């Protein structure tokens, strides 16, 4: 089989409400995942052994990389001994709250299921995905907006697209999920709103009065510890964004814009400050 190249897209979180802490130490949450046009590229080439290389030398290419863990998990599950050479062109920043590693792992599961002719069902792949990480099932199973609960692995396809221009900015600060969960300010006593009808009203009816409900519970602690990240959010709002928020556990921040020219201006302003950025057109979905 000839080498195959596939795009692996990032996501943002529209609202991230941490609802409880389980006895096993994991936190439950409710969030809306939305895809953005920021992607890594993975190339799969035939090989007798399982190997990986990456354009970002800061990332491991052994079993500490989710891509390799995904490949080995599928091998073991299927009893497969076939190899593959994986080349990762890394563009999505890590430690950004954009799910880049999870997206790459999901792409590996899906592609190697075909590449190796494993023919595992989506349900079987879901089990492997959950073991790899809470965000991996979203990238494996969804193309557009999805509501997530549990640890982020219980998904509901909303069949919606965000009708706005989205500017996403990485403030060059790497924040680990472990750090974020250790430092966030719990509000477990709060009654969380149901985000599903709110995002439906936002996307289909243009109802923006609901945007205040889309809080990110990591944001206050992240902003207190990293004021530069807070400034990025304010800069997006000052540039014409009608809503801006931290994505995931950060440090990436995104803003919604009505006009493409305003989004382009904000993008250029952020790039002039040395930040990596992306812009996503309205109604975007993950089509590899």
Swiss-Prot record:
Pfam family, one: GHMP_kinases_N
Sites where the protein binds ATP: 93-103
Kinase in keyword set: yes
EC number in record: 2.7.1.148
Kinase as UniProt keyword: yes
Pathway per the UniProt entry: Isoprenoid biosynthesis; isopentenyl diphosphate biosynthesis via DXP pathway; isopentenyl diphosphate from 1-deoxy-D-xylulose 5-phosphate: step 3/6
A GO term, aspect molecular function: ATP binding
Substrates-to-products reaction catalysed: 4-CDP-2-C-methyl-D-erythritol + ATP = 4-CDP-2-C-methyl-D-erythritol 2-phosphate + ADP + H(+)
Disulfide-bond pairs as recorded: none
Top-level division of the source organism's lineage: Bacteria
Record InterPro entries: GHMP_kinase_C_dom (IPR013750), GHMP_kinase_C_sf (IPR036554), GHMP_kinase_N_dom (IPR006204), IspE (IPR004424), Ribosomal_Su5_D2-typ_SF (IPR020568), Ribsml_uS5_D2-typ_fold_subgr (IPR014721)
Catalytic residues, chain numbering: 11, 135
GO biological process: isopentenyl diphosphate biosynthetic process, methylerythritol 4-phosphate pathway; terpenoid biosynthetic process
SUPFAM superfamilies per UniProt: GHMP Kinase, C-terminal domain, Ribosomal protein S5 domain 2-like
Keywords on record: ATP-binding, Isoprene biosynthesis, Kinase, Nucleotide-binding, Transferase
Family named by the database record: Belongs to the GHMP kinase family. IspE subfamily.
Alphabetical list of HAMAP family matching this protein: IspE
Role played: Catalyzes the phosphorylation of the position 2 hydroxy group of 4-diphosphocytidyl-2C-methyl-D-erythritol.
Protein name, entry field: 4-diphosphocytidyl-2-C-methyl-D-erythritol kinase
Organism: Chlorobium limicola (strain DSM 245 / NBRC 103803 / 6330)
């Amino acid at each position: 089989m000839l080498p195959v190249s596939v795009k692996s897209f990032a996501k943002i979180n529209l609202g991230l409400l941490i609802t409880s802490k389980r006895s096993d130490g994991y936190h439950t949450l409710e969030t809306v995942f939305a895809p953005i046009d920021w992607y890594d590229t993975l190339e799969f080439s035939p090989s007798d052994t399982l190997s990986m290389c990456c354009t970002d030398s800061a990332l491991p290419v052994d079993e500490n990389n989710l891509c390799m863990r995904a490949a080995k998990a599928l091998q073991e599950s299927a009893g497969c001994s076939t190899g593959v050479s994986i080349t990762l062109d890394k563009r999505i920043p890590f430690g950004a709250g954009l799910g880049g590693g999870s997206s790459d792992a999901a792409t590996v599961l899906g592609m190697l299921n075909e590449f190796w002719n494993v023919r595992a069902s989506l349900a079987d792949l879901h089990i492997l995905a959950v073991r790899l990480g809470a965000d991996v099932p979203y990238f494996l199973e969804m193309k557009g907006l999805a509501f997530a609960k549990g640890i982020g692995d219980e998904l509901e396809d909303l069949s919606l697209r965000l009708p706005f221009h989205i500017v996403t900015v990485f403030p060059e600060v790497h924040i680990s999920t472990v750090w974020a969960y250790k430092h966030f300010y719990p509000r477990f006593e709060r009654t969380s709103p149901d985000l599903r009808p709110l995002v439906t009203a936002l996307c289909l009816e243009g109802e923006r009065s609901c945007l205040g409900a889309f809080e990110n519970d990591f944001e206050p602690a992240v902003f207190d510890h990293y004021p530069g990240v807070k400034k990025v959010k304010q800069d997006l709002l000052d540039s014409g964004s009608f809503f801006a928020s931290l994505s995931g556990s950060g440090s990436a921040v995104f803003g919604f814009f009505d006009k493409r020219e305003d989004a382009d201006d904000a993008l250029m302003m952020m790039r002039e400050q040395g930040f990596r950025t992306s812009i996503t057109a309205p109604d975007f979905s993950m089509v590899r």
